[in-house]
Amino acid sequence: MHTRCDKLFYLVCDRLPRERAVGLLTVDNEPLLREAVARGHGTYTAMAHHGALHVVALLMALRGYKLAGVRDRQEGALRRWVQHRLDVLYPELGRMRVLFADTFPREIFRCFEDGYVVASAMDVSRVRFGHQKTEEVTIFGERRAFLSGPLRIAIRCGAPALQAFVIPEPGFRYRLELVELLADPRGVTDEDRAVETAMRAYAANVEKFVRAWPSLLTRA
């Protein structure tokens, strides 16, 4: 049985030497991410609400990536405390930025301009704020509205858009699986069509992933 095991990781994370912590993460298809980052326009990574996203974000920052994550402002106190504790233990985590879902997108534009890897989950259960851009997709036979705002910003900024999933492994280890390039802004002439195509691929990949890893579901 696989679990998210993020809260279990929090019990030991501030006791781990940096080298040991970095070694807990395996990145599949990392050259795809490195190539995207090397273009110099930032990179968007489309995630899903499955797996220990916060843990992997911390470990990616320790590997040297300039990372920005979009989160809910009402995030739990435990996660905020862990973030603070690790900021003190690993000063290099200062390069990791936190953006809140209810803010307007100018900070996301700035992150792409500064070469950050911006990560967010698009598969929301409901759209909370009226200013958020969405795209209708079909997943598990149902029509759902998923968030498309960061993807649109990435295309406008010239930032490649990738998709990735987090898979837990034994011994507090994690695997970040970079699936594919969802959108390459160098070839985009029609933003709406590019977003529609990328979102369709994103939804298909999420459905495939959930069927393969049902134990990572956190709510029915």
Task: Label every model-predicted segment.
Residues G23-V27, H50, V98-D102, R143-R144, ...:
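A conditional alpha-helix N-cap/helix-loop micro-motif detector
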Residues Q74-R106, E113, R128-T134:
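Short, conserved active-site entrance elements at the starts or edges of catalytic domains
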